[in-house]
């Protein structure tokens, strides 16, 4: 790319910031670590947009409590960790099929609005969340999965690079983002904090003059 064409790119447009990718924050709570056998119990997603100053900010969100799929493994230790009572009727849990359909609908709408080509999962320790989303998509056989099959943005890695901290609460503390440990392991709360952290890192790099990148001659 020539210097002239580089200057012509408007990086205040989301479609140009991540090479056509539409970033979507995801957080899941599960009944174990194996996406193929263990139940997906809760999912939250937050789309992002550029504001009038070209800064990345949260946009739309969705949040679902999900019924274990038929034959799913339920690990009691996982339920003790995330505090989910799968038998509580007040959960208002819905089927994986409905949850994934609504998730994909929201993501495709945001992706189209931003004129992006593909969506990418942004999560803390993202391979875990991605594995459960993809496994649920495969089980429900919903067509037109908007997410890239393997590319991800992992905020644990990015936070380690930016701040030397890989734990979500630690990264938030460095970025001066409030974090209530009592609310942690709620998919929606963790997704909201992850969205704030990701936006902070992207915007901070821009404010420092690190993006768009200009190579330094050695």
UniProtKB/Swiss-Prot annotation:
- Enzyme class, UniProt record, top EC level: hydrolase
Q: Name one GO cellular component term.
A: cytosol
| SUPFAM superfamilies for this protein | Ribonuclease H-like
Q: Name one Pfam family in it.
A: RNase_T
The entry's keywords:
Exonuclease, Hydrolase, Magnesium, Metal-binding, Nuclease, tRNA processing
- Biological role: Trims short 3' overhangs of a variety of RNA species, leaving a one or two nucleotide 3' overhang. Responsible for the end-turnover of tRNA: specifically removes the terminal AMP residue from uncharged tRNA (tRNA-C-C-A). Also appears to be involved in tRNA biosynthesis.
Matching entries from NCBIfam families are given as: RNaseT
**What name goes with this protein?**
Ribonuclease T
